[in-house]
């Protein structure tokens, strides 16, 4: 294999997807239509809501699925796969259907983010890559959204490339962070590839390159007069950094009539330093000078800084965002929920576990979000069997699937189906929105959630309920004890 050639992502799959595929082929199951759901069981960080992301990369992957001759040769060398199966892979393409929630959608545990209907081998082979993208980007988008909500309207920039877990973690991580609410990134290639606004100013090395801190600041202001944000903590933040920044602003920017500028702190007692610096800047006639801070920040630390009255206009958030350090796994899974007989009958399937949280919801399903007709606020999500009709002109009783005595009657609501068709018959039917449109959609949808759902500590458990028909099918399968 030529390591300088681009990797074929079709081979980015768990090996057992291929061994199962070979087995399906051998037992005449390759054309059996299957239904798989992608869902997750728990919101990271004990939160009340997650953000779906990663769909665009899944679309690109599905559109380019194929096995190269080099792939076939490698698989043949393993001496596990029949020649008939390898010949099948030579012309392999995805021919199934995929429905998914749009990127930026707030989502909740155990509801389908994506549903795949496809022949068994096709549905099986895409599992790994689908989960890789949705898990990673949903994790980062969710973390970014928490950080941005903590910032309470202040600018948040993604600064984490150098601490990301690999190049892809940095590149698509910046994309996901933008969806979650970040204003931009330090990762240049994410701007080039996806249009995530890239920006940056200086490192401590810039300051150290000059004979004095003042000369470093003056040179930077001369080079970038309309984008002068100076890093003031290389030596002594309050006794040299801020005074030298003010001097450079006075001597270089003020004569040009430029009033917009900034300083950044990357260390020290941020709350104390920003309050002192704000007064120094204001007293020197620089009220428009923005203060940016960084230094291993996350939503909890940002909350704490603002509670202390820190004077901050923007946050640069790095390693704890791009790695989702506090809980670095999203936990999405890809589970069979139904198969289709030759006569078109759909047979529900269930995964049973002694761990109640790991019992799956069977059948080919639809998921709806109920919004208050008067308030526009999201009140509950409702999962039904695919052929059920939801009439939002009539009262509807819903119940907790784990505690069926907990019931709620929905009235005066509007039902919106969350999943939209992405592929039908192997052809893409979905027009992807632009990245800024996805970000705006996320912002708008988060605004439909009550504060009780969004709070960081002990959030309200948002209702995700099953229809009585679906609940009955699930209980019947549980009682039978088989799938």
Task: Please tell me what each predicted stretch does.
Residues 1-35, 42-44, 80, 86-95, ...:
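Buried, small/hydrophobic-residue-enriched core segments of structured protein domains
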Residues 73-74, 142-146, 160, 454-461:
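Short coil/turn segments at secondary-structure boundaries
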Residues 78-86, 166, 394-402:
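Short, positively charged
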Residues 204, 294, 318:
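Residue-level "edge-of-site" marker
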Residues 287:
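Metal-assisted phosphate- and nucleotidyl-transfer catalytic regions
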């Amino acid at each position: 294999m030529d390591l300088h050639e681009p990797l074929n992502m079709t081979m980015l799959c768990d090996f057992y997807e291929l061994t199962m595929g070979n087995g399906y082929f051998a037992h005449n199951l390759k054309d059996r239509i299957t239904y798989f759901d992608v869902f997750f069981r728990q919101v990271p960080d004990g939160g009340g809501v997650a953000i779906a992301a990663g769909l665009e990369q899944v679309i690109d992957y599905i559109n380019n699925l194929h096995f190269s001759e080099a792939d076939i040769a490698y698989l043949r060398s393993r001496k596990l796969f029949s020649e008939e199966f390898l010949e099948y892979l030579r012309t392999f393409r995805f021919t199934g259907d995929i429905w998914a929630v749009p990127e930026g959608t707030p989502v909740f545990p155990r509801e389908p983010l994506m549903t795949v209907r496809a022949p068994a081998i096709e549905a099986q082979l895409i599992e790994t890559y689908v989960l890789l993208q949705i898990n990673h980007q949903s994790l980062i988008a969710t973390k970014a959204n928490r950080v941005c909500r903590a910032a309470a309207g202040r600018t948040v920039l993604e600064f984490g490339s150098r601490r990301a877990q690999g190049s892809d973690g940095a590149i698509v991580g910046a994309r996901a962070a933008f969806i979650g609410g970040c204003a931009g990134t330090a990762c240049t290639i994410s701007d080039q590839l996806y249009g995530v606004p890239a920006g940056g100013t200086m490192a401590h090395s810039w300051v150290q390159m000059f004979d004095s801190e003042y000369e470093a600041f003056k040179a930077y202001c001369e080079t970038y007069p309309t984008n002068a944000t100076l890093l003031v903590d290389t030596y002594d933040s309050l006794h040299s950094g801020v005074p030298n920044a003010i001097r450079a602003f006075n001597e270089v920017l003020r004569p040009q009539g430029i009033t917009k500028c900034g300083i950044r702190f990357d260390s020290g007692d941020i709350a104390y330093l920003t309050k002192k610096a704000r007064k120094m800047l204001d007293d020197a006639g620089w009220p428009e000078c923005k203060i940016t801070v960084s230094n291993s920040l996350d939503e909890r630390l940002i909350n704490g800084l603002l509670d202390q009255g820190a004077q901050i206009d923007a946050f640069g958030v790095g390693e704890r965002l791009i790695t989702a350090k506090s809980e670095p796994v999203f936990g999405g899974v890809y589970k069979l929920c139904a198969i289709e007989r030759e006569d078109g009958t759909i047979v529900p399937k269930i995964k049973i576990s002694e761990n109640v949280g790991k019992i799956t919801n069977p059948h080919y399903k639809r998921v709806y979000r109920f919004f208050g007709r008067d308030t526009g606020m999201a009140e509950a999500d409702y999962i039904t069997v695919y052929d059920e009709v939801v009439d939002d002109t009539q009262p509807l009783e819903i119940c907790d699937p784990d505690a069926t005595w907990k019931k709620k009657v929905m009235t005066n609501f509007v039902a919106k189906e969350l999943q939209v068709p992405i592929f039908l018959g192997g052809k893409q039917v979905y027009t992807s929105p632009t990245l800024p449109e996805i970000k705006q959609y996320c912002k708008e949808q988060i605004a439909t959630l009550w504060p009780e759902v969004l709070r960081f500590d002990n959030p309200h458990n948002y209702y995700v309920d099953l229809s009585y028909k679906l609940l009955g099918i699930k209980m019947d399968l549980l009682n039978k004890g088989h799938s």
